[in-house]
Amino acid sequence: NAGEVASGIAVKTVMSLVKEAVEHQDMNTVDAETGMSRHSIVLRDAIARANKIIYQTAKTQPQCEGMGTTIVACLFFDNRVAIAHVGDSRMYRLRANRFEQMTMDHSLLQELVDRGFYSQAEAQRATNKNYVTRALGVEPTVDVEVHEQPAQKGDYYALCSDGLSDMVEDEDIHLTISTFGANLETVAKQLIQLSNDNGGRDNVSIILAQVVDSFAAKKGVVDKILGWFG
């Protein structure tokens, strides 16, 4: 269907552009105006490009009219992670038994939570979860939300579609990662099974990652010399 076409374009475009940038650009720079790392900028721009391609495809191919998709993506670098998303696909982090949602949904429901009409607990049980306020391919341009967080050894990260987050409580996602974290493939299978057991109204997409060691960027000669002087 058209949604699968849109998500396929998004995955292919973002992966290709990020891979090309990492291999051929100087990634050790920071934008002087925004303070954004090159990694965040590359991720943002790749998603913006995917949006444009999806939008143009929908306009030129009648069978794809009105198609769109949500996205969440991340890029690990220098003991940090750049996180970008559009829509209600989410990223979670488990750190030292503290489980947190690292993205805020671009949805009508989240706006109602922000304005105090719903608590987070009430929002989890709400029926109007799927009205997104941002998506790829709907407009010629899109506002990609990007931020960075420190990444630590032992962290677990879960990126997922609403097919998981709508059907499985955050507490159960937390418990599943904590219980089966030694084998991420098992975690993924358990979470998909939980979603299906709870009604499985939508396809489930999930990516899991664990930080197994420090991945600080290698310093150049000048950086090392400056480091000697504190």
Language model regions located:
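PP2C/PPM-type serine/threonine phosphatase catalytic domain
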Residues: 1-230
